[in-house]
């Protein structure tokens, strides 16, 4: 008999035996078995069977427990294992006979339950009292399994397999749980055409991630529910299969295939009433194939797909389709491709307008139409690694979520007032311990202040709570209105015109009036509100900024003034290069004002000039100005790319080469930080092929890396530096001393044009020639270097005073036109820094002292009072 039991039947008998042993019962009875059936880990088939005959499972369990409580128990170390009593043997015999009559090869848990109802004694009486007679249970069992026989050891997991491993989209559409689908009529019509074919009626939706492939299927489900489809598709069910759920928990070899086979049989038995949908269709290739087996889900689907017995809609991305589906031509030819293209910005705005109500109801906030337009436009402009409409929807969702979080958090006014109250309370506790007259007077004043602040805090809190309630009421009314409209639509569809008319002409208009009144009251109160209640374009821009680091928002007054004074700000740090500062400042202002060419980098410059005049320093100053951190730039030393084989490191190694997965040093840095200053230092030392790579960046603001991903450079400022022709500017070259500045620059540009290809130079925004530094500029640079040293000394509470004579000495001694300002930096380090370090370590200069630096004869005096000549 044991060999004929299904897996779950065997588990139930083992559990019943264990229960009898733990209770000390000498006999194994139908009551033990019934409790084991009810308490099994996978007992949903028993639960469904009892529910089908309207039996109360809790009452059955309680009644069976009472039966067990009356059984005699035996204790002791020599107690024999419990043996099946006469009633249990009769139950098993009855169950075996019924299985034979039904043509089943195995004895399932349902057979045992029916056997208990027929011959289970006291346990059978418990079932009968709840209306679960053997006859009723048998009828329900036959109806549930739908004519299928028990031919495997795990038949219980195969009943209602489609319900278990699928999601009914048409049921979700009928309940109004799906979002509206806008602007995909052509794709839905194409899917309907393919589904209406006689054979190979299997469309596969192909498109980039986030363009709305699943939404097309949801739109089809909504059309089926509305009846807006051809006769061949009317009243059909659209069920999404979950292959992951089928694979999950499949412990034994062949269990996944058994589950899939059962689902396919159920679909086939529906006689064309079920259309299946598999999202991520590429997962069927290889799913379930274990060990050396070639029988995966794809191969199991092929025969039914070819004969037209299975109408399936698939969805997958272009890359996955190419990599997985196209490699199996037999599977590919059974599907008809339907391309889902990325919608335009205008179409995305229409989609967002259709979804606006759902997001307003969910977040209980208002969303301005201008915010939807901003979401579509800004996501298209700045979030280039993803696709519309998904990225625009995410922007709106996150902006609304952020606003909702702000509404639920304390406003700044209340937060600040609460901190003041807490501080006053702590002060009150401290002063309360003092007994002198002045302290008592101070305490009285403090208590009056505290009472006033607490009163003000209570008033503000009450006002904030009232505003929140008003806001929440509007959100709740919108949610209720959405629900009633869904009910009215369902009532019309089901032909319940009485309910539909009550909703359409009674409840819905009344609710709309309430909503209008609440919205008007809220608008009136919004003129002097503490909480913002509408998502606007600035909120969308803030989210874009937090995702990408790009300041896409409207210019604030403070930032406007800062940009207008950009030359002055950069000029504080970069001395004597006004032309270069002007060119860079103009590029940044063009972008922030929104008038720059959106298809090119923010700016691309070639900085030329002798060493040490500020080419690299300007890039650092610009990064500091834009990001408040001079390290926030992508710096690549082009001398590392002098050999041909190193060029690939910029964009990443091609497939098949070591390092392919790592990506390129330039492309990865910009992909992670799309709004940045990119500094390509000493570009003349790079291999000529580097410039071929840079052509696309300079012209179109894009570069394709080694893995085929397009990296967006449109929000970067590209700065290339070079020392070419510097001999004409430094005074150490062939140029005559009386040569004018213009003539020197012309000579430099001639050298540059001879060294770089015309197509490269022609794509740059500007060639900026840096001048050699004069004596006055070196004095200002010396002052900058001294200020930086003073900042470092301030951390040790040391104050630095440098006389004008000392600055003049530094400028004179550090002046070397061939090397720019770098000798001056070294001079400050040796003449002041090194001497000061010795004096600090020797204890001559202590924390809190003022250090004076002055010129004396041929050197400097450094120290708190007087020092030695250097």
UniProtKB/Swiss-Prot annotation:
Pfam families: AAA (PF00004), AAA_2 (PF07724), AAA_lid_9 (PF17871), Clp_N (PF02861), ClpB_D2-small (PF10431). Residues 773-870 are annotated as: C-terminal. This is Chaperone protein ClpB 1. PANTHER family: ATP-DEPENDENT CLP PROTEASE, HEAT SHOCK PROTEIN 104. It is found in: Cytoplasm. Part of a stress-induced multi-chaperone system, it is involved in the recovery of the cell from heat-induced damage, in cooperation with DnaK, DnaJ and GrpE. Acts before DnaK, in the processing of protein aggregates. Protein binding stimulates the ATPase activity; ATP hydrolysis unfolds the denatured protein aggregates, which probably helps expose new hydrophobic binding sites on the surface of ClpB-bound aggregates, contributing to the solubilization and refolding of denatured protein aggregates by DnaK. SMART domains: AAA, ClpB_D2-small. Belongs to the ClpA/ClpB family. Residues 5-71 are annotated as: Repeat 1. The Clp repeat (R) domain probably functions as a substrate-discriminating domain, recruiting aggregated proteins to the ClpB hexamer and/or stabilizing bound proteins. The NBD2 domain is responsible for oligomerization, whereas the NBD1 domain stabilizes the hexamer probably in an ATP-dependent manner. The movement of the coiled-coil domain is essential for ClpB ability to rescue proteins from an aggregated state, probably by pulling apart large aggregated proteins, which are bound between the coiled-coils motifs of adjacent ClpB subunits in the functional hexamer. GO terms for biological process: cellular response to heat; protein refolding. Residues 1-147 form the Clp R domain. GO terms for cellular component: cytoplasm. Residues 84-147 are annotated as: Repeat 2. It comes from Streptomyces avermitilis (strain ATCC 31267 / DSM 46492 / JCM 5070 / NBRC 14893 / NCIMB 12804 / NRRL 8165 / MA-4680). Residues 559-772 are annotated as: NBD2. The lineage of its organism: Bacteria, Bacillati, Actinomycetota, Actinomycetes, Kitasatosporales. InterPro entries: AAA+_ATPase (IPR003593), ATPase_AAA_core (IPR003959), Chaperonin_ClpB (IPR017730), Clp_ATPase_C (IPR019489), Clp_N_dom_sf (IPR036628), Clp_R_dom (IPR004176), ClpA/B (IPR001270), ClpA/B_CS1 (IPR018368).
